[in-house]
């Protein structure tokens, strides 16, 4: 059976949809129409591919991690090197596409939210490239954690607004960015950073990120003469995972594994494991699994990795879970830090803390598989942004 989702109302099973105030409905429908038109517009697609190749540096390598494989002692581990993109992560695959879409709609201003700062940097980058005015909302906590990325965004010409409401993290930044969009909808496009939000955002972001899986599928066939037995990616909102998963969705022999942030542990309140611990609710314009208390109040998500501490998850991931098409697991802060150090030492690659969650689970999974089997892990970003945070953490532990 060929997988087809979302339906015409933007639902993935019972998840997704379009729950937005009347003030945004026109903009969301306009975006939907522009997006559908762009898919069959050969000039648009040609320009998108030009920038992905010449500016972003695609395609990215599928790298056989020989030493990591030997360490795990099982299946071959291939890394899809999204860390080698311009700006150092997968985020730019999506921002390039959406900036071109904004231009097509005649909008010369963009707004975005950011957690780790990677999406903010990728948005500020394309805004500079296409000469657009750019406003980025970032939770005050994340501004502190990722001060280097704040400076990067400002260097690129963006205005960074520190959000002091609520938990002062990603969820609150999204709230403020949506408010800003409502007030400036005529000339501003909202560049959603993950497979979240009202329809058509989850579909748009999935499609722009699918370049990851399309390339990985082709590259793995060239290297191994077969499809991988498993594919693994970290999941916050879930765009790098969806980008890897979607092109494999009809290949039933390929197991799909999403890895959430377990923070201090699932038994504590300090985690971001939405699929494991969430319940269905509406957040930021879509029906999805959400971390919430018994009164339906959104809980704060927690992770060492600023890019994973979102209290919801892309609706299509929840749908994959319900279909049994993908499995979701979680990895603690400590396990992610261990995997971060392991990849540095075995392969000479400094991964983002987000991606380190995927590496941690991949090593466990590979050890249970046979040597003739193989897997693809999405190395979603590089870890330069995390080195300082890690240094402080390890120094604290040494002093305890």
UniProtKB/Swiss-Prot annotation:
Family according to the record: Belongs to the TrpB family.
Gene3D superfamilies per the UniProt record, alphabetical: 3.40.50.1100
Organism: Listeria welshimeri serovar 6b (strain ATCC 35897 / DSM 20650 / CCUG 15529 / CIP 8149 / NCTC 11857 / SLCC 5334 / V8)
Free-text function comment from the UniProt entry: The beta subunit is responsible for the synthesis of L-tryptophan from indole and L-serine.
Keyword Lyase assigned: yes
Enzyme Commission (EC) number: 4.2.1.20
N6-(pyridoxal phosphate)lysine sites (modified residues): 91
GO cellular component: cytoplasm
Gene field: trpB
Co-factor requirement: pyridoxal 5'-phosphate
Pathway terms, separated by semicolons: Amino-acid biosynthesis; L-tryptophan biosynthesis; L-tryptophan from chorismate: step 5/5
Protein name as it appears in the record: Tryptophan synthase beta chain
UniProt cross-references to InterPro entries, sorted A to Z: Trp_synth_b_CS, Trp_synth_beta, Trp_synth_beta/beta-like, TrpB-like_PALP, TrpB-like_PALP_sf
Subunit record text: Tetramer of two alpha and two beta chains.
Pfam families in the record: PALP
